[in-house]
């Protein structure tokens, strides 16, 4: 029998263990009983904006990583998975993609993916925190690939709900907004009202015929408060739209299976069986993650996950 102290090192020994492996560490509280420690090479940038603490750090395993209010948001190593899953299924499902609205996404990565589609004529990105946009435009242009300078793009520094009060409609609406609760159960009052039935219903009212709404809808670990918050978001979206489908993929930097939910008001085969191969080939798109094969896998959930709802 192995002595317990050989399996579970006492916390008193933790500082020594960390110092011998990496000089700097980032601690992220995933829940009340689960903490993630990431080794950091360097803190590249830090600014307290009007809305949040913005930090950019070079992680030993994740590369350059965006941290907002102590939570990892975008990591160089796997952001392409998250953004491919958020953007490209919606672009395939929509009947037309001429006009696209992005809510949040101040890092410019979702915008970068939308602009890969030649049929996109106009994109409006609505971001409440101007410092987010300026940070990525100036410090990390290789992430955005010049997306903010594209002539098809209009940037609005505003609350996401403001544009929904205007007399405009869209073929695709993408929500890259931070979910209202983190894994520990703490509430984010800034985004809480952006995940209500009223808000999602307002989005549905701004979609053109056979338009598609895509939203990042949090993560799943099959334990703890993270799952409960995800289920609440999914049920709220389902209450506002006639048809919904949820995609699932593990994101290493989030330590969870992450989800994107797609919704529309018309029951069309384009959302249940979209022409992925044809759409990608016609537009000359060879994406890093999203393919016809990965599309099928994204929408194939294990029974234990389906039973959450």
Which functions belong to the PLM regions below?
Residues 63, 210, 258:
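Active-site lining segments that contact anionic ligands and/or coordinate catalytic metals
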Residues 216, 241-252:
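Conserved S-adenosyl-L-methionine
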Residues 2-25, 49, 74-215, 222-234, ...:
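The AdoMet/dcAdoMet-binding core of the Class I SAM-like
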Residues 39-42, 52, 160-161, 245-249:
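Glycine-rich, charged/polar anion/phosphate-binding loops
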Residues 2-55, 257-309:
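SAM/dcSAM-binding transferase cores
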Residues 67-68:
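A general beta-strand register signal
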